[in-house]
Amino acid sequence: MMEFRTASMEYIERMCEITEDAKRQLRGMGLDQWQKGYPSREVWLKDIQDGCTYLAVDDGEVQGIFAFQTTPDPSYEEIDGVWLTDGAYASMHRVCVADGCKGKGVAGQMFAKGFDLAREMGFPAVRIDTHPENFPMQRALAKAGFQPCGQIHLVGGCEDGDLRIAFEKVL
């Protein structure tokens, strides 16, 4: 049975391994998403320090990772489109599933955990974004109930200005 743990230093190597596998998969799909040094070990270390990253663990094995954030995302301030809600929201970022665990519902369980966290904290919605051509992620988002809202450009970091499709799920 899947359980969720707050990421800690004991998992950093596995987190980096899963991330590098995801980067290779995206590169193999011909996408530039996550190809400029993000997310990095330093990003995960800050997430661990901030307590905002969760691990999906089944039978002692880390199968997935996601960051859950409760502060406004600067990338979501301007959208070519319309958000489903106004005001406060939570967001999920850096969602990745370990090789060998894809297609087993891990992403769906991580999204469900994010929705539960958001509800517990009183947020009416969860937002997320992905590359316009990352069709596997877009399918996973649709399956989880996210609705496309428009296009955004990332703000800050090594992917500054990159185009993404923005999604929102009303809880």
Q: Model-found features: residue ranges?
A:
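Conserved active-site alpha-helix within GNAT-family acetyltransferase domains
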Residues: 108, 120, 133-150
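Conserved acetyl-CoA-binding loop-helix of GNAT-fold acetyltransferases
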Residues: 97, 103-116, 139-143
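Conserved GNAT acetyl-CoA-binding A-motif
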Residues: 111, 118-130
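Conserved acyl-donor/pantetheine-binding loop and adjacent beta-alpha core of acyl/acetyltransferases
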Residues: 67-96, 102, 155-158
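Conserved catalytic-core motifs of GNAT/GCN5-like acyltransferases
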Residues: 129, 142-163
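Conserved GNAT-fold acetyl-CoA-binding loop/helix
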Residues: 23-43
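Conserved beta-hairpin
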Residues: 50-68
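A short beta-loop-alpha structural element at the N-terminal edge
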Residues: 3-17
